[in-house]
Amino acid sequence: MLSLIKIAAAQTQWPKRDNSKYSRHGVSLSMNINPLLRAYEHGVRRFPRENLQNADLSGFTLISVDFERTNLIGSNLQRTFLTKARLGHCQMNWADLTYAKLNQADLSHADLTKASLYGAFAVKTNFKGAKLSGATLAHANLRGANLEQTNLTGANLFAANLREANFQKADFSWANLQEACLSLANLRDARLWATDLRRAFMKEMDLSALSLHGLAMDGAKLTGSCLRDTNLSHSSLRGANLRGADLTGANLTGVDLTGADLMGANLTQVVWHDAVVEGVNWEEAIADQSMFREGILGLGNHHNHRSHNVHQGRQGLNISCFGGLQAAYVI
């Protein structure tokens, strides 16, 4: 049994480690959380490499605690206050962090495989290099968090607040991002394979040159986003909002834009082969002759053979046609 903690009058400290209680890997073989909590109350903050597997720390206040490289596998941390905590390199597989307060905490390179962070508060938290495959982050607030190079394969981020978060080189393969807010997030070099982005909020994002091939993006909000040279081939964007988006040079081969809103979008140099555009709002959109060269399914329904209003502009000939589409022939 762990010896009782002695609190000296002049200095409070965690008891010296008895190596007989530790494995050859330096991890505690037994851990009673009561001495830990008492030590925390007396100002001790460093508890690195402890064994807290399956420990119940739910609801406790552990602000700025140092659990670096601690074993927290299967631990209960529901509603625990871990603001500014040091949890780097921790083993947290299957841990329950539902509604935990993790704002500005360091979870870099932590293993959170299959962990639950449902509704957790992790604003400006550092998850760099963390493993979050199969984790639940639905309704979590990760605004401004750093998730660079994180493994989010198969993770559930339904309706999560990911605004302004850094996902550079993150892996979202098979992840659920339905209704998630990604506005102003950094997805540079992120992997989005079979990612579900239906009804996701992606306003004013830089998605240029990304591969968004074959994704479910129905109802996504992409207002004002940059999709220059982006590969959207064979993706479904039915009912998506692309108002004012820049799709210059984007690959829309086989894309389904049924009922999408492209008002004011820049569609120059787009590859349209076999794109489906039934019921699209083209008002004030800018396009070029590729709209007429390639096989676009549904575009003909908006075309009539009446004379068009043609005038010479600074960028070339602007032709008002297809129910509001303005095709700019750059010359």
Swiss-Prot record:
Keywords recorded for this protein, A-Z: Repeat
Residues of the Pentapeptide repeat domain: 50-89, 90-129, 140-179, 185-224, 230-269
Superkingdom of the organism of origin: Bacteria
Entry annotated with the keyword Transcription regulation: no
Xref: SUPFAM superfamilies: Pentapeptide repeat-like
Disulfide-linked positions: none
Pfam family membership, one: Pentapeptide
Transmembrane segments: none
InterPro entries for this protein: 5peptide_repeat
Keyword Calcium annotated: no
PANTHER family: THYLAKOID LUMENAL 17.4 KDA PROTEIN, CHLOROPLASTIC
Protein name stated in the entry: Uncharacterized protein slr1152
Originating species: Synechocystis sp. (strain ATCC 27184 / PCC 6803 / Kazusa)
